[in-house]
C-alpha cells in the first residue's frame, strides 16, 4: 500500500514530470517551463527526474523551484506511489508519452497537459483527455490556470480501452488451449 500521500504538502495539486531531451537539454525551453509553472502560482508537485535535476543545476534554475512555496519537489517514485500521486492530483502535466496513456485508463481518468509541440499519442488528444501546450512560458501559465479553474472535467471514454485487456487475453488463451 502506498504511503506517498503522507509526504504531499498540498490538498490539491498538479503532478508534473519533465524528462525529454528536447525540453530539459534546451536552456530556453526548460526556463520557459519553469517560468510557466512558477507564474501559475498553483500547487505543483514535480517528480524530478535525475536528468532534469542535472540540467536545472547546470542552468542555475534549481533554486527558483526550491524557493517557490507552491512547488514541492520529490524524487522519482515507484509505480504504485506514482499511481497514487496521479489519482490524487487535479491533473497531470508531462512530456512523457507513457504517462499520457496511463492517465486515460478507467482507473485514473485524468486530464493531461502535454509539454510538447506534438505527441505520438493523438488518440488522447482527440478524446479530449490531453492538450498540447506550446512551450512558451505565457502559454504554459495560461494553460495551467485554465485547467485549474475548471470545476468539473468531463472525461471521455479512454481511447486505449476499458482496462480489461488481461481478462480478454485470458479468455482467448483459455478458449484455444
What are these regions (language model features)?
Residues 49:
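Conserved C-terminal portion of the radical SAM core fold
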Residues 44-46:
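Short loop-to-beta-strand entry elements in the cores of soluble alpha/beta enzymes
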Residues 1-42, 52-177:
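Nucleotide-activated sugar donor-binding and catalytic core shared by glycosyltransferases
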Amino acid at each position: 500500500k502506498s504511503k506517498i500521500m503522507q509526504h504531499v504538502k498540498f490538498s490539491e495539486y498538479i503532478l508534473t514530470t519533465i524528462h525529454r531531451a528536447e525540453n530539459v537539454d534546451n536552456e530556453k525551453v526548460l526556463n520557459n517551463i519553469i517560468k510557466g509553472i512558477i507564474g501559475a502560482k498553483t500547487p505543483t508537485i514535480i517528480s524530478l527526474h535525475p536528468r532534469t535535476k542535472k540540467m536545472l543545476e547546470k542552468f542555475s534554475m534549481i533554486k527558483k523551484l526550491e524557493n517557490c512555496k507552491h512547488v514541492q519537489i520529490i524524487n522519482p517514485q515507484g509505480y504504485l506511489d506514482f499511481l497514487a500521486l496521479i489519482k490524487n492530483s487535479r491533473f497531470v502535466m508531462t512530456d512523457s508519452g507513457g504517462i499520457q496513456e496511463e492517465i486515460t485508463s478507467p482507473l485514473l481518468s485524468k486530464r493531461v497537459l502535454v509539454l510538447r509541440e506534438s505527441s505520438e499519442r493523438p488518440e488522447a488528444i482527440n478524446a479530449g483527455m490531453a492538450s498540447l501546450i506550446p512551450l512558451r512560458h505565457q502559454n504554459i501559465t495560461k494553460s495551467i490556470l485554465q485547467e485549474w479553474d475548471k470545476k468539473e472535467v468531463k472525461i471521455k471514454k479512454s481511447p486505449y480501452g476499458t482496462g480489461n485487456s488481461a481478462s480478454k487475453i485470458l479468455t482467448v488463451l483459455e478458449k484455444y488451449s
